[in-house]
Curated annotation (Swiss-Prot):
Keywords: Cell inner membrane, Cell membrane, Chaperone, Membrane, Protein transport, Transmembrane, Transmembrane helix, Transport. InterPro entries: Membr_insert_YidC, Membr_insert_YidC_N, YidC/ALB3/OXA1/COX18, YidC/Oxa/ALB_C, YidC_ALB_C, YidC_periplasmic_sf. GO terms for cellular component: plasma membrane. It comes from the Bacteria. GO terms for biological process: protein insertion into membrane; protein transport. This is Membrane protein insertase YidC. It comes from Dinoroseobacter shibae (strain DSM 16493 / NCIMB 14021 / DFL 12). It is a multi-pass membrane protein. It is found in: Cell inner membrane. Its main location: membrane. NCBIfam families: PRK01318.1-4, yidC_nterm, yidC_oxa1_cterm. Residues 59-78 have a biased composition (Low complexity).
């Protein structure tokens, strides 16, 4: 391998190292609220302790009408239980809020007594997070004539919401309007919300149906720039994402009474909040135009998303019904893809944060997912995926390793050219290029597989980091969560000594690495030894340290990523060794290892 080739490899490795350091040392800063920002006011003029309901649908709403915003305790409100294979919780009859929801199949940690993940919480609980439906008044109606956040509903039918038994809620306004809300749920995470209004009067009534998802206070987020957390929406084919700190910078919209972004959707769309693994989304019927709203209510510190359907006219003596959906659950690829296909929810699969390299992350995840279903072990699936990637890149790798072998054959001639050129670098470069051209050798060909590995590495990193299928995915022995760092540590001899490993994220955990990062460093070091050390002393020193620097830098990354990197190094080693031997160059692995431990004499460095 000549100096140009080594310089390119070194530059690539160092650039990769800089990116890793940036990942570790420079996460985004916590958002800071501007103390000089204008105070937001609710439509009622009071502090809003519950979601800010939409304004009147049209300007001719009854004078003095105001949405319900005053807080009402929910802990004593009657409830209807939710009981499905995937979900458990309850619906508060106060406002008909879906505000108590937990995910049966997901625990917070791997501990045996770990509680299941709670997704939604009522207003009087820490981190309140809930879905709310209602009607905004239009025409001659006031907010007292329509159900809102604090309306007390009664159960018309259904004692428990299950997959087979929907629940019907009922409320009469006392002025001839009867409102019903039918809630149904499937085996996974999709609710169907059907709102109807029966007009028993003789005059037409007008009102606008809406749905709201509200979060009180900024939730605990990972706050890492490779992951989106916050508003996620689809607007007629365009994906819209806003972090929580972005919402603080929305323009103040007078009609909304808050900082808000309002989008008019013509045919297909949805909006909600996404976390790393969980999501809540309001989904109008595909083909239905609606208004999509994301807002931040500053004086109450409430983040919310809304969908507002077109204003409905309910003729006297008739009933009008509208249907929407609510997704509330885990971002499982199979479930989300199924909803996109079966329900026609455009772009729903893009609610998973595939990142800039989506053209790589999507197929990589698909193959990894299918392999895991086939094999039944995510760690083994990652190794098989690595084999498939290396097989796909084999034609390029073959050419590059053949080129490297040819470079070895030309080494004696290159040394002669160096002697002839002396200190004339320009003359040497010209002579080298003529030699390469004559022998049909590309000196940079050896770097191509390395360059291709960078986007693949970051795509796999993205897949492991953001997809829920890797969460708590076991490999073997102590490796029970491939989305988490290696739990073993050299400090207690990988579990042989009777004391715990360092706390993850601590300085000790960075120093006393686990067995997987150690194997990574060794595999990189052995791969280097297929070639003699560079003649340039500076290059030789950097190359000597590079495997061990990567070992410590990658030690805090997800263990699934380290498994991939180790497998990649081992396969690359085998490929390179076999191809180079086949083309006449026999790597002196043992000799290069021995030479790396010998101390050079000063004369050898000159």
């Amino acid at each position: 391998m000549d100096d140009q080739n080594k310089n390119l490899i070194l530059a690539t490795a160092l650039s990769f190292l800089v990116i890793l350091v940036w990942f570790l040392l420079f996460p985004p800063e916590e958002p800071v609220t501007d103390p000089n920002a204008p105070t937001q006011i609710t439509q009622s003029g009071e502090t809003a302790d519950v979601a800010l309901t939409p304004p009147a649908a049209v300007t001719e709403a009854a004078p003095g009408a105001a949405p319900q915003t005053a807080a009402t305790p929910t802990e004593n409100a009657p409830r209807v239980q939710i009981d499905t294979p995937a979900l458990e919780g309850s619906i508060s009859l106060l406002g008909g809020r879906i505000d108590d929801l937990s995910l049966r199949n997901y625990n917070e940690t791997l501990e045996p007594d770990s509680p299941i993940v709670r997704l939604l919480s009522p207003v009087d609980a820490p981190g309140a997070y809930y879905a709310l439906y209602g009607w905004a008044p239009a025409g001659t109606l006031s907010f007292d004539d329509v159900p809102g956040a604090n309306t007390l509903w009664t159960v018309e039918s259904g004692d428990t919401l299950t997959v087979d038994t929907p629940v019907v809620l009922r409320w009469e306004n006392g002025n001839g309007l009867i409102f019903r809300r039918t809630l149904a749920v499937d085996d996974d995470f999709m609710f169907t919300v059907t709102q109807s209004v029966e007009n028993t009067t003789e005059t037409d009534k007008r009102m606008q149906p809406y749905g709201i998802i509200a979060r009180h206070g900024e939730p605990d987020t990972i706050n890492f720039f490779v992951l989106h957390e916050g508003v996620v929406a689809m607007a007629d084919g365009s994906l819209i994402e806003s972090d929580y700190d972005d919402m603080l910078d929305y323009d103040f919209v007078e009609r909304e009474g808050a900082r808000a972004e309002v989008e008019q959707i013509e045919q297909n769309g949805w909006i909600g909040f996404t976390d790393k693994n969980w999501m809540t989304t309001l989904i109008p019927t595909p083909g239905q135009p609606f208004t999509s709203v994301a807002k931040y209510v500053g004086n109450a510190d409430i983040y919310q998303t809304e969908t507002r359907l077109p204003t409905q006219t309910v003729p006297g003596g008739q009933t009008v019904t509208v249907e929407t959906r609510l997704f509330a659950g885990a971002k499982e690829w199979e479930a989300i893809r199924g909803y996109e296909r079966e329900l026609g929810i455009e772009g729903f699969i893009d609610s998973i944060d595939w990142g800039w390299f989506y053209f790589l992350t999507k197929p990589i995840f698909f193959v990894l997912h299918e392999l895991n279903l086939l094999i039944g072990n995510m760690g083994v699936a990652i190794i098989v995926l690595t084999l498939l990637i290396k097989a796909l890149l084999l034609p390029l790798a073959w050419k590059s390793y053949v080129s490297m072998a040819r470079m070895k054959e030309l080494q004696p001639e290159m040394e002669k050219l160096k002697e002839k050129a002396g200190d004339d670098r320009q003359k040497l470069q010209v002579a080298m290029m003529e030699l390469y051209k004559k022998e049909k050798v590309n000196p940079a060909a050896g770097c191509l597989p390395i360059l291709l590995q960078i986007p693949i590495f970051f795509s796999l990193y993205k897949v492991i980091f953001v997809t829920i299928e890797l969460r708590h995915a076991p490999f073997f022995g102590p490796f029970q969560d491939l989305s988490a760092p290696d739990p073993t540590s050299i400090m207690n001899l990988f579990g042989l000594l009777p004391f715990a490993s360092p706390e993850p994220g601590s300085i000790l955990a960075l120093i006393f690495i686990g067995i997987l990062p150690l194997l990574l460093g060794i595999s990189m070091w052995l791969q280097q030894k297929l070639n003699p050390a560079p003649t340039d002393p500076t290059q030789a020193m950097i190359f000597a340290w590079l495997p061990w620097v990567f070992m410590f830098m990658l030690g805090t990354f997800a263990s699934g990523l380290i498994v991939y990197w180790i497998a990649n190094n081992v396969i690359t080693f085998a490929q390179q060794y076999f191809i180079m031997r086949r083309h006449g160059y026999k790597p002196d692995l043992f000799g290069n290892i021995v030479a790396s431990f010998k101390k050079k004499k000063p004369s050898e460095d000159k």
